[in-house]
Amino acid sequence: MKQTITEKIFSDHVGAQVYAGEIVESKIDMVIGNDITTPISIRQFEKSGAAHLANPDGFAIVMDHYIPTKDIASANQAKISREFAYKHNLKNFFDEKDIGIEHALIPEKGLVVSGDVIIGADSHTCTHGALGAFSTGMGSTDIAYAMITGKNWFKVPKSIKVVLKGRLGEHIYGKDLILKLISMIGVDGALYKALEFCGDIQNIDMDSRFSMCNMAIEAGAKSGIIAADEITKQFFKDKNLRAEPKYFYSDEDAFYERTVEIDMSALEPMVAYPFLPSNGKTITQAVADELKIDQAFIGSCTNGRLSDLRIAAEILKGKKVAKKTRLIITPATQKIYKAAEHEGLIDIFIDAGAVVSNPTCGACLGGYMGILGANERCVSTTNRNFVGRMGDRTSEVYLANSAVVAASAITGKITDPRR
C-alpha cells in the first residue's frame, strides 16, 4: 500500500509500516520547550522521579516569550528553566546570550533535519515541517513524557494535499498563500490532518515555506509539511546539523483525504480580518475599507526572518512612519538582528521612526513590547488575531505580510505595497 511522506516518517521511527489512523509510539528526535511551557514539564519530570533525560542532546529549551523578563513572575518562571538546564548540563539551552524565537532559532541552529519527528510545547512547532520533518505541538505533560522516555504516542494523521501552481507575484509571499488557504478551508478545515504542500514548490523560498507551515495550526492541522528539495538542501549547507537528513517523499498514488489547488499567479496580498485567521480578504478589499491603524508590527516566528526585514527596509527607506502610527520591528533571532545591522537595515528602520526590539514573542501573544490598548488597531505579521490576542479585548489585529505592514506604517492605514 502506498504511503504519504508523513506515514513514511512514522514508519521509519516505529520500525514497521504504519498508516493514517493507527496509534503508534514513536521515537522523538527533538523535544522543544520555552520559558512559559517548560516549567510545567520540569515539574512533571521531577514528580516522576526520573534522574536523567532520555536524550539530553534531543531536548532544547529556548527562552523567548518573556526574555528579558518583564516582571517578577516571569523572572521566577525563567529561573526554573535555567536551574534545570544548568543541573542537567543542557547543550541546547538558549537564553539571553543567544536569544531567539524558538521556531526561527531551532532551524538556524541545525537542530531539525528532514525525516525527523519533532514535538514542542508550543502550537507553532509545526513550523519545522518546512524542512521535511513531521513536527507538531503538544502539551507540557506530553513533553515531560518525552523527556523521560524519548518517545511519545501519536495517531498517524491523514493528509490533505495542497497543490500550488505557478509563481507568486510582486509582494506576495508564503504568508499570503497560507492566509488564502485558511480562508478557503476554515480554521477547522484540516483538523488533526497533515497539510502537505506540493506542486510548484520550487518557486517558493525557504522563509515563505516556514511561514506556511507555521500557520498550518491555524487551519486546525496537526502538522504542515513540505518534502525536501534543492532549496531545503541549500538551507542545510551552512548549518552544523544535529544529524544527517533522511529524505522521504510521498508515493504518487498515496491516499489523501482531500486535495486543494491554489493558483499562485492569481493571488493578491492577503489580509486576515479580526477575529479569525480564516477571515481573509484581498488587499484590494482591505484598501477599499479605509482601515486606519494605530500600530504596525513586523516580527514573530511567522515573519521575523531576514527576508522580512529586507522587504520592510526596501519599502521604508527614505520614508517616515505616519504621525499617529507606531511601528515595532522584532528580528526573530540575534543572528538575524546582527545581519540586519550589517546590511544597514536597522538604520533604515530607526530613521523611519520605528522601534527595533530584541528577539521576543512578547507582542504576538499580548505579553509585552507592543501591547494594544482599548479600541486600537494593529496590522501585524504575526499568526493569530483572536479577541484580545495582542492586548485589550476591544483591540483589533489584522494579519498580513511584511510588505503590507511596512507600507501601512507609512500611510497610517492598511495599504497595498504594490501601489
Curated annotation (Swiss-Prot):
Q: Which NCBIfam families match?
A: hacA_fam, IPMI_arch, LEU2, PRK00402.1
Q: Which UniProt keywords apply?
A: 4Fe-4S, Amino-acid biosynthesis, Branched-chain amino acid biosynthesis, Iron, Iron-sulfur, Leucine biosynthesis, Lyase, Metal-binding
Question: Which CDD domains does the annotation name?
Answer: IPMI
User: PANTHER family from the xrefs?
Assistant: 3-ISOPROPYLMALATE DEHYDRATASE LARGE SUBUNIT 2, HOMOACONITASE, MITOCHONDRIAL-RELATED
The reaction(s) catalysed by this protein are: (2R,3S)-3-isopropylmalate = (2S)-2-isopropylmalate
Question: Can you name this protein?
Answer: 3-isopropylmalate dehydratase large subunit
**Cofactor(s) required for function per UniProt:** [4Fe-4S] cluster
Residues the entry annotates as binding [4Fe-4S] cluster: 301, 361, 364
- State the family named in the UniProt similarity comment for this chain: Belongs to the aconitase/IPM isomerase family. LeuC type 2 subfamily.
- Please give one Gene Ontology molecular function term for this protein: 3-isopropylmalate dehydratase activity
Quaternary form? Heterodimer of LeuC and LeuD.
Task: List the Pfam families.
Answer: Aconitase
For this chain's record, the cofactor binding note is:
Binds 1 [4Fe-4S] cluster per subunit.
Entry function: Catalyzes the isomerization between 2-isopropylmalate and 3-isopropylmalate, via the formation of 2-isopropylmaleate.
Enzyme class per UniProt: lyase
Q: In which pathway does it act?
A: Amino-acid biosynthesis; L-leucine biosynthesis; L-leucine from 3-methyl-2-oxobutanoate: step 2/4
Q: Which GO terms describe its biological process?
A: L-leucine biosynthetic process
The reply to whether DNA repair figures as a keyword in the UniProt entry is no
The EC code for this enzyme is 4.2.1.33
